[in-house]
Amino acid sequence: MIRRPPLSLLDLEAAPLGSRWALTAVLDALPWNSDGLIAAIAQQHDSGEVLMLAWMNRQALGETLASGQACYWSRSRRCLWRKGESSGHRQRLIEARLDCDGDAVLLLVDQQGPACHTGRPNCFYNAIRDGAVEVISSPLKDSRHDS
C-alpha cells in the first residue's frame, strides 16, 4: 500500500521496512534549499566509486526518474543540465535514494565514459595529503568534455 497523506521526514525515519509513500508527498516534504535545490551525489552502481556532486531542482529530479538518465540543475547556466548530452558521457540511473535528512539524493548510476568535465573518471581527483593537494588522476584518453 502506498501512503499519500502529507508527511514529514520523521514519518520516513519511523516507518517499518517495506513502507511505501507516494513520491509527490515525499518530494513535498524535502527541505529544498532557498534556491529550490538539493545536493545530488552520483555513484557508480557496481564499484561504489563516488563520481561527482551536483545539484537538482524538482524538475531535474523528476526528469531523471522519468527518463532513467541523470539530469541536474546547472547553477552557473541556470538551466537543466542533461549529463552527457554534448559529450555522450551519460549516467544511466539504476536507483535513486534519499538520505535520512532528505537534503541529499544518491544516484546509483552506470557511468558511460568519464564523469568529470575535465575528462577524469570522477571529480574527486585532488587528494589532500600531508598539508598539500595532490592530483591523483589523469584525464582518460579520447575524452570529450561535458559542458
Curated annotation (Swiss-Prot):
Catalysis: reaction(s): 1-(5-phospho-beta-D-ribosyl)-5'-AMP + H2O = 1-(5-phospho-beta-D-ribosyl)-5-[(5-phospho-beta-D-ribosylamino)methylideneamino]imidazole-4-carboxamide
Keyword Nucleus: no
Cofactor: Mg(2+); Zn(2+)
A GO term from the CC aspect: cytoplasm
Pathway: Amino-acid biosynthesis; L-histidine biosynthesis; L-histidine from 5-phospho-alpha-D-ribose 1-diphosphate: step 3/9
Enzyme Commission number(s): 3.5.4.19
Example of a GO MF term: magnesium ion binding
Signal peptide annotation: none
Binding site for Zn(2+): C100, C116, C123
GO biological process, one term: L-histidine biosynthetic process
Keyword Lyase: no
Cellular location(s): Cytoplasm
Any Pfam family the entry gives: PRA-CH
NCBIfam families the UniProt entry points to: PRK00051.1 (NF000768)
Listed HAMAP family: HisI (MF_01021)
Subunit composition and interactions: Homodimer.
Protein name as annotated: Phosphoribosyl-AMP cyclohydrolase 2
